[in-house]
């Protein structure tokens, strides 16, 4: 029984699904997808639970969310292992994901009050009050790269705001989704407030096409995000928050500390085996001897990175990709760029055929035409050389995406120029592209999102504002508008 609908664990009636470890092929989870009828049942349960949940005092909703945080802390080791085994990422990184989930609770509570709490301004004849109301029933689509943390970033603020939810994890990480939902169950969520439906494309389409949804919160690829945007077009009454991918540039100017620049680049491009939406995909390096030295050192150090199993000791910097198919896709993208005329600086290599272990690849594409503007979700870094900083910014903006952008430079004026001219939601200076502050919004423009950033701003798309002018007494104004006559006429 792998679906949780209206407080009950039930068996899916759709396609049979099996999840294996992407490196060892060990079977981790088996179950059946939710069919369309079960997806509709989950929506009905959420709709029925909404009136009571939204009328609960905020303190009551907060107490359940904080109980969930305590359960995450108590089961940190267990959830860490589930995430690591299911995604293939090393244990150390999976542990940081669970820590981020725990920290998200307090941050979301603060963000609720700061962004969508109640504010009152006293007027001479009453008060002006701003309140926020939940949308109702929301669908949450989770990704596979951070199967605990990223859905958590939608679920927690949505529940705090008073919404009820249907959660569909990625079909590649059903075990993590189920494990997290069991902690919510233990936290005491009332039946129907949060429902779990497992499945792939058919389940997702059944969920997103429900007429009774009030909105959809999505983290994933641009292609799926665009499909959802088209599907919900003509329905302005539904909130749609899309957090999609990026083809992110990292600009390397002349720097004295080459090793520090190489370290920042490795953290930007290859952490999580390149499976972060903010990962650097395009490396823009200034022409000249210093740029040459930087690239040589980058190839040297990156060439020593050896992906390993989630539980290897000592721990590797990177583990496997989410699947052997994902690793193959990266290899095909590299070969495609070679065929276009790219010059391989570091060839990616499958560590073991049939597994998702893949070493990093680096390819130079300066002057190469028709390079696809796409997000290759894995450890493949494309390099361009530039002559001057204006050209670097032009190259950086030469993408339909707009998630993250970074600069490695000691020149503050260059960063100020980048802030003015970069088209990206995240612009970092001498910091990895993959670093983000939880007290700031997280999201992008263009093909990276629809102007609904998450993290600190997630509260914004989980509730709508309600403005009120109010007074406890009804009085006739001392001064009336022109043309109004309230004089008493004597009866004839």
Curated annotation (Swiss-Prot):
CDD domains: ALDH_SGSD_AstD. Keywords: Arginine metabolism, NAD, Oxidoreductase. One of its GO terms (molecular function) is succinylglutamate-semialdehyde dehydrogenase activity. Its EC number is 1.2.1.71. The gene is astD. This is N-succinylglutamate 5-semialdehyde dehydrogenase. The active site is at residues 243, 277. It catalyses: N-succinyl-L-glutamate 5-semialdehyde + NAD(+) + H2O = N-succinyl-L-glutamate + NADH + 2 H(+). It comes from the Bacteria. Belongs to the aldehyde dehydrogenase family. AstD subfamily. Pathway: Amino-acid degradation; L-arginine degradation via AST pathway; L-glutamate and succinate from L-arginine: step 4/5. InterPro entries: Ald_DH/histidinol_DH, Ald_DH_C, Ald_DH_CS_CYS, Ald_DH_CS_GLU, Ald_DH_N, Aldehyde_DH_dom, SuccinylGlu_semiald_DH_AstD. NAD(+) binds at residues 220-225. One of its GO terms (biological process) is arginine catabolic process to glutamate. The lineage of its organism: Bacteria, Pseudomonadati, Pseudomonadota, Gammaproteobacteria, Enterobacterales. The keyword Phosphoprotein does not apply. Catalyzes the NAD-dependent reduction of succinylglutamate semialdehyde into succinylglutamate. SUPFAM superfamilies: ALDH-like.
